[in-house]
Amino acid sequence: MKTRLTLILVLLIYIGAASHTHAQQKKVIKTMMIAGQDGSHYWQGACEAMKQILENSGMFKVDFAFTPDFGGDIATFKPDFHQYDLIVINYGGATWTEPVRKNFEKYVADGGGVVVIHSSVVPMADWKEYNEIIGMGAWDGRNEKDGPYLYWKDGQYVYDYSPGYAGYHGLQHETVIEHRAPHHPILQGLPPQWKHFKDEIYTRLRGPVRNMEILATAYERGRHEPLMWTVSYGKGRIFVDLLGHCGNDPYSMRCTGFQVTLLRGCEWAATGAVTQEVPADFPLKDTYTLRPEFKAPFHAYPKTKH
């Protein structure tokens, strides 16, 4: 009788542990996506595309936090950052109010995850801590007073303190992305070079460039310009991705490379680790691949049991 009770007890403990492990594996990353007031981009389409990319992975649940339209009262924008594991910024408008700025700074410093997409490096140049959080930015009056240009040359960072404005882009085009920190969790196992579909490539960014690690660059206008990087701010992890232009259509976001690095960057920013497999459809140096439905095809993860 005692042996039988012991076996039952062991079985119950095993079932409980297995259920707990399963629950941990299924934990969804609560994500707030901030957007609005960007007259140069179809931010609504970009938000919907990224929401699909994130939620189709099964790892994220995305809520939108939109600011008022241009001319509206920015004081009505009062997001509760601390309810979320991750904040994705897809924003290009007015500087947030001081209480919101302070709450955001605390959220990040306390360990919150942040992902900054494309033109979100442009606004709020007058907010010192935002510049620290994003590492470097473009336009919006930025120049040598805000910090140096940063680019990659001969395996090293180059800090260029020469005077000049921040920010430039030419016509949209395909480009080859080169990884500069291949052992970082976001890039671990991915091809070191891959072709990205047509996009608007930002160059000549400048800023405080503190606590930054360049992840990837592209060769533009005679030098290797950073396109992806991370920043540490207090206990917080920030992933900045300059890819993802959305004019009338989010076609750049259909690129498999964009989607995979976005997913991996979001997971890393939220948790400090990346658990995702390297997909079979990831692009190579000479060939881009697309996921037009903003989700992985069935064959992309052959090791995963469906």
What kind of feature is each model-predicted range?
Residues T6-A17:
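Bacterial N-terminal signal peptides
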Residues S19-A23:
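Boundary at the C-terminal end of the N-terminal hydrophobic targeting segment
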Residues Q37-S40, H118, G164, Q172-E174, ...:
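Active-site rim elements
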Residues Q25-I29, N56, P79, N211, ...:
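Extracellular ligand-binding/catalytic regions of CAZymes and related secreted enzymes
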Residues Q24-K26, K30-I34, D38-M124:
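Helical hinge/lid and interdomain linker segments adjacent to catalytic or ligand-binding clefts
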Residues I34, A94-P185:
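A glycine-rich, often tryptophan-bearing local segment used as a flexible ligand/cofactor-contacting loop or short
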Residues M1-L5:
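Positively charged n-region of N-terminal signal peptides that target proteins for export
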Residues E55, K61, K153-R237, Y301:
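Catalytic beta-strand/loop cores that center a nucleophilic Ser/Cys/Thr
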